Each structure stands twice: as C-alpha cells, then as structure tokens.
C-alpha cells in the first residue's frame, strides 16, 4: 500500500492494470458472459480539495448562484467550446456538499463515457471536481442529417451474435420511444425485460465512435453493449449492471450461524433511524403482511426466472415472522427463515446507509420517496434461494428509478447445502454494489464502475462494509476476518487473504494491483487498504456497539461508523470510473468536508502502509 500514498497528486492520470491474481478468486461475481475484454479504459481525472482550492481561487462565481449554476459555470469555463447537458440527479448530501453531474454531447448526442462531476461546498465554492470529457476532434457533420448508420434491429442482432446472448430476436421490431433515437424492441424472447437501444457516441482510442447502446437484461448479466453503428458485429465496449413486526433472525452483527443463534427482534425499524418512515411493511399507500415494503421485496425464486411479483413470501397477518432453522436442514426446508433473514439484513443495511447519506436524492432503493427527491419506484427486489445459479450471488443496479435486483443462491459446497442468505456478509456485499453504483457518478448513471480498477473497488467496498459491520466489541486491529467462509465451507474464505492489518497474514499492497486483471483480486487489495482505514479510525474514536451511529456535528462519533460514512461520502465526490488514487483523495476530501480534516493523519497513515 505504500505506493498508493507515493502516487501523489499527479494521479489525475489512470493507472494501468495487467496480469492475474495469485489465487483463483471465487464467488460473489456475475456468472455467464465475461465482459473483461470489453471494459472501458480508464480516463477519469480528479481534482482533490487542496488542488481545487488553489486552482479555482480566481474562479468567478456569484453568491446569488445556486450550487447547480456554480457547477455549470465551472464546466463552461473549463471547456468553453464543448457542449454538454446537466444530468437531472443533482442533490445536496447530508454532509452539506452539493453534487452536480454533466454529460458531454456532440451534435446533441450523448458521449456516454464522457462525464464531469462538480462538488460544491457549504460556502458555495467549488470543493472538488472530476471529469472524463473527450478533448479530441469532434465529428464535423451531424450523423442524424444523412443517417448513415445501421438501424437498431441490426445492432441488436450484432450484440446477440457477438456476445452469444441468450436472447432470440425472432421478429424483433424497434419501437420508437419519447427520447430521441431511443427504441424498445418488441418480438424478442429470452430477456427478462424488453431490450432497448439508444444512439450514443463513445470515446475510445482517442476518437469518437458512433454506436448503438443495446440494453439486454438476461438475469445474471444486465448489459449495455456498445455496438458499432455501421459494423454491427463489432462490439466496442460492454457495461454490466450486475455486479451479482417480530422476526426470528440472526441479529445484526452476526455474520453467519457460527457466530450465534437466531433471536427474536421486535419492530427493528424503531432502532434504525429515519430511513423507513412507513415501517418495513408499508410504502405509504399499501401495508403488507408479507416480506415486502417500501425498501425491499423479498421472496423465493426457485425457477430462477425474471418474474417475482407472485413468488412465494412468508405471510403473517400479525407480522410475526418466526420460523425454525438448524444446520441439518436442507435450504428448501427453511426457506421461510431464509427469506425473513434476507428481508431483515437488507432493510437494516438500507436504514444504516440512509443515516450515512444514501437517501432518496442520492438514489437509494425505495418505492415511495415521500416527496424527498430522487426517482422512486425502485425498491430492491431480493430473491432468496434463486434457482438461476449456485455458489454465488449478484446484484443488478440500473439507474435511479429502476428496481435493483439481488439474487442469492444456495451453496453446494457442504452437505447439506448452505443458503447464502444466512451469511450477512454476502448480502451486505451485494447490496453495497447498489450503493456504489448509484453514488459514483450520480444516481442517473450506473456505468461509473465499469472499468477494471473501478470495478475492483466496487468489489472491495462490498467486502469493506461486510467486514466493518461484523466487528465485535472485543476485536482489535489484530483480529482477522474472511469473506464467504461459512457459505462456501472453505477455511480461509473465498478471497486470497483474510482481512488483517498484519502484513505477515495479508501482504497485499497497492503495488500488487499492477499484476491483476480480475475485479475480485483488485477488490481484495482495496478492501485491505480500507481495513487499515477502519482500524486507524477505531483506534482514534472507539467503536459503538449500537446498530445506528450517534452523530456529533454531522459526523459519527465512533470510528467504525465514521469510516463507513467517509467511504460513502468519498463515493459521491470521486469521478466516474475512478482509480485507487482518486478514490483515496476523495475519502480524504470527504473527511475535510465532514470534520475539517481532523482525521487526515489517520487516513494518510493507512494509505501509506
């Protein structure tokens, strides 16, 4: 990790990544289509707070401007000859920082991987910013004038053929939507929803390429395939959105059945803050007597199909979800318990993240946003014992306003099989994909962890939150934790090394990233770094045993929750498709915004190891 600090402020340029991790990584990754050959190259730049303060001290802004106007002026002054649009997902976070996102355009057509994010401080001045705008030669003619490109149906056929998608186009017809050059395909089968196509540019190899962005949700992969607008069997790049009452449950903080016994918990939303004003079983219009509410719909899905509305859920008119589990039972025998556990874990994590700032405006997963901004109608669909796979899990994160989807599988690595729903770390890891994909680049853009290093950090954030939440009061920085050990029945877990601050047990440093070409290995390095961050802050501020943090002047008063808050706030600051150095700078900037930099030394020490 020493290289991460030494990389310094010059890290506005992307880092190169190549090679393979030392050990075969397993679990918690989408099955099916390998998108690694099609990932976008890293192009983002990030101006951290200190550099931004020096750079924009003479920037002209008016005290009468709101934060969106100030952000817009910065983009115009930085790229005066470029065209762009404001993405409609700006908001002010709980730390007082305003977040505004912009998409570059050419001839009125989006450049899909060209983004600019501006973060405005409480004083109305630019706090930090990042961008991946295209600075090369623009197309001289508007492609819509001559329409010298293939129709979207050919692009759909090209994506299916090239990527071997399990979609049958049959008599596909492209039906125009309200948005210009956007189409929905009718007459197909094999996808969970109707495929879509939109005409967009992408930047690649220093040039702009006109493409059809073909969207196909095939379950284990929810893909945006950028098909060349003329040579429709050429797929330039691919983005995958999947990354994947009374309750008798394993209580919050118990990672799996080896750590304790199920207990009775009554009305848990009363102890989890303001994130669920309708309780966990209502959405402001409907009250449910099953494992469904404003935040989560949890059900079984033995067929593995895309239908979920009418799938089985435990039901109790008295809201008494009390079911039995023992380790000799097969998963099917305790599905009521498993669905209830999944419902409990995801709702609790939703409410915890809400307290940290993953709110309606920030793009969280809720049916009813209760007039607080954001798109709504996008609670998380959580499938227990999903029959589409085994020994894994995934979470699909489309943009704000579309449902997130979690698929939890059974694990055949033990006899009897084990249910991943009972390992909280796996559930938290998957839901954290929804968090990071909604926050990085803004809630309207789910493409901002699509590059290799950024995607690796997406995996690392999941492991970080899973590990931070399972810490016990008597743990010390000499305590190590694994991922997936119980479900996989694998001593040492499914990662290369356990998370530990001692380099004799976990020798990973930032320099190891250079030899990796797989997101889970990269994620293990990132989570290892964040585990040091976590313990440095706990050593400074202690660790609360409460589920929800206590806030003092807007910041959690204990180290564990402060670490989780700073990591979350950092996601909102960093550019689309960040690298390690930019993410590090964003976390340090998040501390500057939240505590006036009180924890900079502890953070820098962790990043310099």
UniProtKB/Swiss-Prot annotation:
Main location: secreted
EC number, UniProt record: 3.4.24.-
GO terms under cellular component: extracellular region
Active site: 430
Keywords, sorted A to Z: Glycoprotein, Hydrolase, Metal-binding, Metalloprotease, Protease, Secreted, Signal, Virulence, Zinc, Zymogen
Pfam families for this protein: FTP, Peptidase_M36
Residues with glycosylation annotation: 270
Subcellular location(s) per record: Secreted
Highest rank taxon of the organism: Eukaryota
Cofactor stoichiometry and binding remark: Binds 1 zinc ion per subunit.
Gene3D superfamilies (UniProt xref): 3.10.170.10, Neutral Protease Domain 2 (1.10.390.10)
UniProt keyword Secreted present: yes
Named cofactor requirement(s): Zn(2+)
Top enzyme class: hydrolase
GO biological process: proteolysis
Residues that coordinate or bind Zn(2+): 429, 433
MF terms (GO), sorted A to Z: metalloendopeptidase activity; zinc ion binding
Cleavable signal peptide: 1-19
Family designation: Belongs to the peptidase M36 family.
Stated role: Secreted metalloproteinase probably acting as a virulence factor.
Protein name: Extracellular metalloproteinase 2
Record organism: Trichophyton equinum
Taxonomic path: Eukaryota, Fungi, Dikarya, Ascomycota, Pezizomycotina
